[in-house]
């Protein structure tokens, strides 16, 4: 009986973690769509509207995705004149990183 209850607790914990991950992915997707999609391709299949804006699904070919965490939290500044500065808050940074990891081309 203890084994059954322990197993059920583990299943519920994994389900809750999966639900939180799904919420974070949706939040990251929404943030990037709102803040970045006027120039960048922020999804798995769209194209960038600005010719010099990289596709977000290919960022891992240029940088380790985790390396963007600090820049997103402290303020993202680009030398490109059309790119505005962005600074995201803690949970938003995590959601963006999770979403970016989920869409990378393999």
Which residues are covered by each model-predicted region?
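Electrostatic cytochrome c docking/interface patches
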Residues: 13-31
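The canonical Cys-X-X-Cys-His
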Residues: 28, 33-42, 96
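Short, solvent-exposed mixed-charge patches
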Residues: 105-106
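Short secondary-structure boundary/capping segments
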Residues: 28, 46-48, 74-75
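Bacterial N-terminal signal peptides
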Residues: 2-15
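Extracytoplasmic electron-transfer domains, predominantly the class I c-type cytochrome c fold
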Residues: 55-101
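His/Cys-centered metal/cofactor-coordination and adjacent catalytic loops
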Residues: 17-22, 45-50, 54-59
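Short beta-strand/turn micro-motifs at beta-sheet edges
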Residues: 42-45, 70-71
